[in-house]
A protein has these predicted regions:
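Nucleotide and nucleotide-moiety/phosphate-recognizing core
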Residues: 2-118, 128-143, 149-166, 170, ...
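Active-site YXXXK catalytic motif of short-chain dehydrogenase/reductase
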Residues: 124
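Conserved TIR/SEFIR loop-to-helix hotspot centered on a Trp-containing motif
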Residues: 121
Length: 207
């Protein structure tokens, strides 16, 4: 049985730490802590990798009892080359069914998240790189909003390259990091549901 693979997209290195473009990496690191994940550098994958076991507790339902092995991956390539870290792990369309990629999305307001499946990259370079590397769009993603919003909570998407760069390369404020930590609990539960009950159930419950 092939492992589940959860990927958190971002750029390696200190200068990118805490930036909005690193949202996937930040969230997967927080989720890893919940599982006492021990990260190790995998030179072959050019990534930080941790092995955990995920699943609902046995009491949730006898049928769902038991936990499944999951590989957490934080690519150490730059965003545009993320596929290099994923290609050796996802070798078929079938194995892509157990892949989830967590990443930042400018088309959604900060603090929101959505599970999607089998969609285009939407211009996200990291996602584009993974799609090219594994030759399929048929995998799950957790899109996490990073765009500013109006006082009424509507999306205020930046327009123009400079404005976009300013948002994605800007660092999260401490109060925004608290919002991400809260969001990580919801995403962690969604990932557990995905592993134990399948994608449809996770989408119905968390979207």
């Amino acid at each position: 049985m092939s492992n589940y693979v959860f990927v958190g997209l971002g750029n390696p290195g200190q200068e990118y730490e805490g930036t909005r473009h690193n949202t996937g990496r930040i969230l997967l690191s927080i989720i890893g802590k919940q599982y006492d994940a021990e990260w190790k550098e995998d030179k072959k994958l050019s990534a930080q990798v941790a092995k955990i076991k995920v699943g609902l507790p046995a009491s949730a339902s006898r049928r769902q009892a038991g936990k499944s092995p999951v590989t957490l991956v934080l690519p150490d390539t730059f965003m545009n080359n993320s596929g290099k870290s994923i290609k050796p792990l996802i070798t078929s369309v079938k194995s892509a069914e157990k892949l989830v990629v967590v990443y930042d999305d400018l088309d959604m307001p900060f603090g929101s998240s959505k599970i999607s499946f089998n969609k285009s990259s939407g211009g996200h370079r990291g996602l584009e790189s993974i799609i090219k590397a594994i030759k399929t769009e048929k995998f799950a993603r957790v899109r996490v909003g990073i765009s500013p919003k109006t006082p009424t909570g509507k999306l205020k998407k930046p327009s123009g390259e400079d404005a976009v760069m300013k948002v994605i390369m800007g660092k999260f404020k401490p109060e925004e990091m608290l919002v991400l930590k809260k969001l990580s609990k919801k995403i962690s539960e969604a990932l557990e549901t995905f592993v134990s009950s399948g994608l449809e159930r996770a989408m119905t419950r968390f979207n």
